[in-house]
């Protein structure tokens, strides 16, 4: 399979590239060339900033494009304007943060997503991250209604996580003499 991975040299994308290599896919890696630019020397790399000129992608053919770093709907629209006629499938890595409210149990794909009064904002914050990802999803579905796959992962943790959001807790637990937290055996998660 011919894959194009947008992003791919930092955290999640790196692991996607490694799995694609293990599966012997033909990979093109599209990234800025700033973070770990030489991480995959045997993989075709196209260095570009997705916020600038995307012409280097025009006319290229891929079975699937996996977009790991779309944060603003403009980025998704601009990318798909260049590549949508020459790809089989567009995979957008979104987030469970798109959901408008986590106060209810049993959220499904049909649950309402967050919205913004200013849908063209590019101000990233805790309040805008989820709704912006939801707008990115919509941009993908508008461009490729039958050839888009939206993935809404929860917290992604693991080797090379630059946020240290998971490994922080095992270290705290290891160093703590006593830990107090609420016990609710019917809850699917504690926080």
Task: Pin down the residues of each PLM region.
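N-terminal Rossmann NAD(P)H-binding glycine-rich loop of SDR-like oxidoreductase domains
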Residues: 3-25
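Glycine-rich "substrate-gating" loop/helix at the edge of Rossmann-like oxidoreductase active sites
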Residues: 154-163, 183-191
